[in-house]
Amino acid sequence: MNPDNDNDSLPLLTLPEQLFLLILNPETGKLPYTFVPLFHGFVGCGIAELQLMDKVIVTKQNSQSFNNNKMLIKVIDHSKTGDTFLDYILSKLSNSFAQKGLQMATAILTISVGLNKMKRITETIAQSLIKKGFIRGTLKRSVLFKNKSIYEVIDYQAKLSVESSICKVLSTPPDYPDNCLRELIILLTFKQYEDFLIKPKLMDSLISRLYHPEQCAHIKANLRLINKNFYKEPSEVHLTNDPSVKMLSLVIGGIRNAITSE
């Protein structure tokens, strides 16, 4: 094993890749169109993955600060993960500007802008999924003569697996987040785009596809319960003693703040 590449702990599908598969429309091969960039959610999930890999931690800002409840993201392990997208995020969080720590929304916005200029975030994640054999990518020329990427799902089992894990959480909301933390991160990230989609409503579309019509109202109520139980507003995060709830709240709050800042 390369000591500079700690990919033994890298999951088969990273959180950004799971989010990509979840929102990819298998019929059109397209990602949904939103008023705001999808990549804020991808970056937020990437930071969450690095937290789960113990590459980054969340620390409280210096107590001498005016607002000592402010939480910052800091890198504690600079070794590469073996994933191009995660390694880019890690490098941005490791630079001199970010060494003292960044608030989650600031980190997401900083990384989104940087990678968007270098290479489109969605294409970076797609290339990883292509290499792993989950999707196939093609370029389609639009009416404006601009090439646009279209993705064909090759491994439907992988997409179904992501959907099934989300379905399980929605069907039976957990009392504690620890055993389904990855699913909750994906689900609550997914939910942040509800207010910013043109059509169809992404969450409504997913629920309608996974459940019988008579179940949909109950499942939507479960989603509201999950959001209430495991997402705390920024002003309340420091009041919880549950590290998983704290992590979820900081990640999802950062994604939402990045989205609404657009």
UniProtKB/Swiss-Prot annotation:
The keyword Protein transport applies. InterPro entries: GPP34-like, GPP34-like_sf. Coiled coil: none annotated. It comes from the Eukaryota. Transmembrane segments: none annotated. It is a peripheral membrane protein. GO terms for cellular component: Golgi cisterna membrane. Its main location: Golgi. GO terms for biological process: protein transport. Phosphatidylinositol-4-phosphate-binding protein that links Golgi membranes to the cytoskeleton and may participate in the tensile force required for vesicle budding from the Golgi. Thereby, may play a role in Golgi membrane trafficking. May also bind to the coatomer to regulate Golgi membrane trafficking. May play a role in anterograde transport from the Golgi to the plasma membrane and regulate secretion. May be involved in vacuolar protein sorting. Belongs to the GOLPH3/VPS74 family. This is VPS74-like protein DDB_G0288371.
